[in-house]
């Protein structure tokens, strides 16, 4: 494969070693032209969409290309943990199976099917409150035209005030650099008009929703407001909530 494909495989392998598994989607289609029950393998060279989610739990760079129902362009396969039980009624129903590195549905550059997911969760009691705008209908990704800012305003309603320890943002690209700033009691229409309490540089390696611990905890009193402002020097893709 290309250098980019090799790099992508290495990143996925690193995440499997770190987290134990990855979530992916691929196109599952029954049929002897795709399934090889003798080798518990699957390879579909023609479909770029997806219809089924599975977990990637390992890999074998030397898995023979001949061990697929149709010979793949090269050796190598991901070890997949499926959710359809252990009964051997087809390779994709045998608990685990091998998915070719070259399967079209996990290599499309035209859709989001190349995404792999991990969930790095924290303890539920790590924070007392989550300040958020909830209830929207879905998410979309916007890509800016050059440098940009993203911000939001929050009001402190807790009696006794609040201590802000972390903020969050959704990013739709790899290797993103930005400056994160927190402003206290900004004026309406200008979220950077308040008192600057904190500014820190942030690097986000992977796309997704990230919780960013602040370099210092910030205290607010009931009735205060604060603005969270991200500044990007270059074009950036952001996850944005939407109601329509």
Model-identified regions with their sequence ranges:
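Acidic Ser/Thr/Pro-rich low-complexity disordered segments
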Residues: 34, 87-96, 186-195
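Conserved catalytic-core surface of thiol
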Residues: 60-62, 66-143
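Beta-sheet-rich sandwich/jelly-roll-like modules and their strand-loop junctions
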Residues: 105-192, 196, 218-223, 232-244
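Solvent-exposed serine/threonine-rich low-complexity stretches and specific carbohydrate-binding patches
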Residues: 193-205
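Short strand-edge motifs at loop-to-beta-strand transitions and within beta-strands
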Residues: 208-210
């Amino acid at each position: 494969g290309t250098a980019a494909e090799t790099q992508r495989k290495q990143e996925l392998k690193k995440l499997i070693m770190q987290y134990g598994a990855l979530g992916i989607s691929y196109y599952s289609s029954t049929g002897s032209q795709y399934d090889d029950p003798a080798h518990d393998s699957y390879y579909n060279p023609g479909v770029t969409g997806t219809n089924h989610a599975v977990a990637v739990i390992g890999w074998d760079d030397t898995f023979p290309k001949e061990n697929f129902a149709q010979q793949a362009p090269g050796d190598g396969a991901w070890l997949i943990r499926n959710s359809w039980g252990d009964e051997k009624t087809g390779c994709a129903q045998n608990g685990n199976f091998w998915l070719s590195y070259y399967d079209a549905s996990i290599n499309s550059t035209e859709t989001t099917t190349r995404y792999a997911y991990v969930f790095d969760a924290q303890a539920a009691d790590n924070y007392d409150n989550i300040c958020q705008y909830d209830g929207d209908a879905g998410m979309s990704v916007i890509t800016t035209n050059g440098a940009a800012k993203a911000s939001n305003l929050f009001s402190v309603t807790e009696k006794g005030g609040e201590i802000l320890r972390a903020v969050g943002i959704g990013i739709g690209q790899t290797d993103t650099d930005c400056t994160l700033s927190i402003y206290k009691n900004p004026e309406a229409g200008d979220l950077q008009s308040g008192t600057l309490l904190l500014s820190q540089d942030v690097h986000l390696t992977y796309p997704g929703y990230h919780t960013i611990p602040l370099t210092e905890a910030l205290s607010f009193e009931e009735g205060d407001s604060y603005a969270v402002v991200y500044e990007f020097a270059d074009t950036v893709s952001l996850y944005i909530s939407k109601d329509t």
